Swiss-Prot record:
Gene Ontology, cellular component aspect: chromatin; chromosome, centromeric region; cytosol; DSIF complex; nucleus
Listed InterPro entries: RPABC4/Spt4, Spt4, Spt4/RpoE2_Znf, Spt4_sf
Family classification: Belongs to the SPT4 family.
Species, as recorded: Schizosaccharomyces pombe (strain 972 / ATCC 24843)
Record protein name field: Transcription elongation factor spt4
Function: The spt4-spt5 complex mediates both activation and inhibition of transcription elongation, and plays a role in pre-mRNA processing. This complex seems to be important for the stability of the RNA polymerase II elongation machinery on the chromatin template but not for the inherent ability of this machinery to translocate down the gene.
UniProt-listed Pfam families: Spt4
Keywords noted in UniProt: Centromere, Chromosome, mRNA processing, Nucleus, Transcription
Gene this protein is translated from: spt4
Subunit structure: Component of the spt4-spt5 complex. Interacts with RNA polymerase II.
Gene Ontology molecular functions: RNA polymerase II complex binding; transcription elongation factor activity; zinc ion binding
One GO term (biological process): transcription elongation-coupled chromatin remodeling
Length: 105
């Protein structure tokens, strides 16, 4: 992404990566493969950070994005997934942790 356009960008509710709506719609999320833009992304997010070296970054470990694709990530994403969707993710081996600041584990 050359330039972050906050009016056209969305953040993934699962991993927090920030991408243009069109990328999510055409390719899905690069980290978890979901492609239902309306269910799995939100246009409302706070703070952004660029993560270029996931395995070397203490911030990436702290934000729990150290196993994800390098890119721009939101520190908080407004919205949560419903329980049916969370269960479906769990069956696929994806551990969902809300990125809206409500999870304190």
């Amino acid at each position: 992404m050359d330039k972050l356009n906050r009016t056209r960008s969305r953040a993934c509710l699962i991993c927090g990566i920030v991408l243009p709506h069109s990328v999510f719609a055409n390719k899905g999320c690069p980290n978890d493969g979901v492609d239902d833009v309306e269910t799995f992304t939100s246009p409302v997010f706070e703070g952004i950070m660029a993560m270029m070296s996931p395995t070397e970054s203490w911030v990436a470990r702290w934000q729990r994005i150290d196993t994800f694709t390098p890119g721009i990530y939101a520190t908080r994403v407004q919205g949560v997934l419903n329980e049916d969707v969370v269960e479906s993710l769990r069956r696929r081996g994806i551990n969902y942790r809300p990125r809206n600041g409500t999870s304190w584990d």
